C-alpha cells in the first residue's frame, strides 16, 4: 500500500511567508523545522527560506541545529529541547539560541556565564496552557 504524499511548492511557500510578513510587520517569524521539517526536509526548507535573515528556524536538538548550520543556514536557530551543559559551548560557538523553560535552566546559564564570561542567547519559554514546558505565569518567586 502506498501512503499519502505531501508536496511543498517552494514558490507558494515563499509567497505565503511574504504575505504573513506583510501582515505582522517587524515581528520575526519562527519556522519550525524539527523532526526533519516534519518529513519535508529541514535543510531544504531552511535553506530555501533563509533569504530572510531575520527568519528564525526552530529545531529540537543540538544535532538538528548543527545539521542546519553545517548545511549553510546562517539564520538564528532556536533549540527547543532542555538545555544540556555538555553542548552549551557548541551552542554559543554556533550562535544558537537555547530554550530556558525552568529556573534550573537559568541557574545553569548563570553558572556558565560566571565561569566562562559568555553564554548562548536565551529564549524564555512560558507555559501558555499546555502545562508541559515553560515558566508558570502565576509563579512570581
What is the meaning of each model-derived region?
Residues 13-16, 20:
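Alpha-helical packing segments of well-folded alpha/beta enzyme cores
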Residues 1:
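Gly-rich Lys/Arg/Thr-decorated short loops/hinges at beta-loop-alpha junctions or inter-strand turns
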Residues 4-8, 12, 24-141:
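Active-site-proximal beta-alpha core segment in soluble small-molecule metabolic enzymes
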Amino acid at each position: 500500500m502506498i501512503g499519502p504524499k505531501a508536496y511543498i511548492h517552494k514558490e507558494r511557500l515563499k509567497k505565503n511567508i511574504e504575505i504573513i510578513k506583510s501582515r505582522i510587520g517587524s515581528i520575526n517569524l519562527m519556522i519550525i523545522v524539527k523532526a526533519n521539517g516534519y518529513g519535508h526536509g529541514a535543510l531544504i526548507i531552511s535553506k530555501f527560506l533563509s533569504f530572510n535573515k531575520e527568519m528564525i528556524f526552530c529545531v529540537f536538538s543540538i544535532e538538528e541545529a548543527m545539521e542546519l548550520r553545517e548545511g549553510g543556514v546562517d539564520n538564528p536557530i532556536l533549540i527547543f529541547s532542555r538545555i544540556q551543559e555538555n553542548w552549551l559551548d557548541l551552542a554559543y560557538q554556533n550562535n544558537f539560541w537555547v530554550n530556558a523553560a525552568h529556573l534550573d535552566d537559568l541557574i545553569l546559564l548563570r553558572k556558565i556565564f560566571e565561569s566562562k564570561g559568555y553564554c548562548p542567547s536565551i529564549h524564555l519559554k512560558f507555559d501558555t496552557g499546555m502545562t508541559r514546558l515553560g515558566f508558570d505565569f502565576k509563579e512570581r518567586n
